[in-house]
UniProtKB/Swiss-Prot annotation:
This is Toxin zeta. Disulfide bonds: none annotated. The keyword Kinase applies. The keyword Nucleotide-binding applies. Toxic component of a type II toxin-antitoxin (TA) system. Phosphorylates UDP-N-acetyl-D-glucosamine (UNAG) on the 3'-hydroxyl group of the N-acetyl-D-glucosamine moiety, yielding UNAG-3P. UNAG-3P inhibits MurA, the first committed step in cell wall synthesis, which is then blocked. Phosphorylation is inhibited by epsilon antitoxin. Part of a postsegregational killing (PSK) system involved in the killing of plasmid-free cells. The zeta toxin induces programmed cell death. It comes from Enterococcus faecalis (Streptococcus faecalis). Its EC number is 2.7.1.176.
Length: 287
């Protein structure tokens, strides 16, 4: 009996052809292609980097997002029934292979590429940049610089949104996985900066403001700027709307008993101004 995670070469090749056709529609190969590698901790909002890249390339860029290939596994529905929230673990080998195959196919033709990642390690960006430069690509790295409290809340909000859409496949990002990237990203970015593999390393906030460019300040490492933004204190005014949105979604999903819900409520209570003490009524003489 075949393993439910298995798929045939024909199934894979057929889907690969469809993906390549879809991704390259209205896109043109160029003489001097550029590959943009994206980084940032989970929940930081890496999709917002696409706006800056689209503007830079006049929209002529192919976005390769590993997550979008997971549901393409030929047996995805059966795997969901069997593994539910753990399904991602069983379809990731498929999505990884699809990502690699698409990059290989498009790099040979010279399309501008956006390749999503996190920056949790330095190995993958170095290998990817080296491989693409062998095909005469210019390689750049654009990274989200977002306070860690904002990105962690982003992972919770994303999960609650996914849960409302499909409880069986909604998968939370463990806080530990988020925090590992937060801890490693500044040092990893400094290492990547020193390799000289990237013609430009940029840091952007969620508003699309460029906070750093190695092209503009080549002697300065991105590490300090990123650490400062990751650890920046966030005002109550800045964080309150996010907390309220998450609380509302968690109530709708009936997640009031979760530790995350209790933590959200505690944080919201801490942002409320203290209640002024009730003044004591002065005693009148003889009473």
């Amino acid at each position: 009996m075949a393993n439910i995670t298995d798929f045939t070469e024909k199934q894979f090749e057929d889907r690969l052809e469809k993906n390549v056709e879809r991704l390259t529609k209205n896109r043109l190969a160029v003489e001097s292609p550029t590959a943009f590698l994206l980084g940032g901790q989970p929940g930081s909002g890496k999709t917002s980097l696409r706006s800056a890249i689209s503007e830079e390339t006049q929209g002529n860029v192919v976005i390769i997002d590993n997550d979008t290939f997971k549901q393409q596994h030929p047996n995805f529905d059966e795997l969901v029934k069997l593994y539910e929230k753990d399904v991602v673990k069983y379809v990731t080998p498929y999505s990884n292979r699809m990502t690699e195959a698409i990059i290989s196919r498009l790099r040979d033709k010279g399309y501008n590429l956006v390749i999503e990642g996190t920056g949790r390690t330095t190995d993958v960006p170095i290998q990817t940049a080296t491989m693409l430069q062998a095909k005469d690509y210019e390689t750049k790295m654009y990274v989200m610089a977002v306070p860690k409290i904002n990105s962690y809340l982003g992972t919770i909000e994303r999960y609650e949104t996914m849960y409302a859409d499909d409880p069986m496949t909604a998968r939370a990002t463990p806080k530990q996985a988020h925090d590992i990237v937060v801890k490693n990203l500044p040092t990893n970015l400094e290492t990547l900066h020193k390799t000289g593999l990237f013609s430009d390393i940029r840091l952007y906030n969620r508003e699309g403001v460029k906070l750093y460019s190695s092209l503009e300040t080549p002697s300065i490492s991105p590490k300090e700027t990123l650490e400062r933004e990751l650890n920046r204190k966030v005002s109550g005014k800045e964080i309150q709307p996010t907390l309220e949105r998450i609380e509302q979604k968690m109530v709708q999903n009936q997640h009031q008993e979760t530790p995350e819900f209790k933590a959200i409520q505690q944080k919201m209570e801490s942002l409320q101004p203290p209640t002024p003490p009730i003044p004591k009524t002065p005693k009148l003489p003889g009473i």
